Amino acid sequence: MAKVSAKYEAMYIIDKDLGEEGIAAVVERFKNLIEANGTIDEHEEWGVRKLAYLINDKPEGYYVLVKFTSAPSFPAELDRIFRITDGVMRSLITVID
């Protein structure tokens, strides 16, 4: 029997050069997208942190961690949207047991 929903964790890094308003807009966009396709269990904004290595010649990024529950098909779509969104430097989605 197929799973109806599963728990996931998404971490994404936003380019801090977008400024406060730009970062807030990106965070709000993904919050709304996840809420429209599931439920947010936990949302943490870690703020600006030093990157382990340069990404696009930038030493820092704005980190956001979201734990959510959704249908198993949604994370693939979320990952696609992370990849095409300007300002998102890196993202990772994992399944939580």
Which stretches of residues belong to each language-model region?
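Structured, basic alpha/beta domains of bacterial-type, RNA-associated proteins
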Residues: 2-97
